[in-house]
Curated annotation (Swiss-Prot):
Keywords: Carbohydrate metabolism, Disulfide bond, Glucose metabolism, Hormone, Secreted. GO terms for cellular component: extracellular space. Disulfide bonds join C8-C37, C20-C50, C36-C41. Heterodimer of a B chain and an A chain linked by two disulfide bonds. Its main location: secreted. Belongs to the insulin family. One of its GO terms (molecular function) is hormone activity. GO terms for biological process: glucose metabolic process. PANTHER family: INSULIN, INSULIN/INSULIN GROWTH FACTOR. Pfam families: Insulin. InterPro entries: Insulin, Insulin-like, Insulin-like_sf, Insulin_CS, Insulin_family. This is Insulin-1. The keyword rRNA processing does not apply.
Amino acid sequence: MAPPQHLCGSHLVDALYLVCGDRGFFYNPKGIVEQCCHRPCDIFDLQSYCN
């Protein structure tokens, strides 16, 4: 598994598409940017935004 990373902008959206796949995701910019851009996040953090 990959170590936690800072993901911002298009990198964050690409990671969500990769993790969530066909389920899609809900995009709450304030929450996910705070969690994954300002601080490093891991795959489990990203999965919490999947539908």
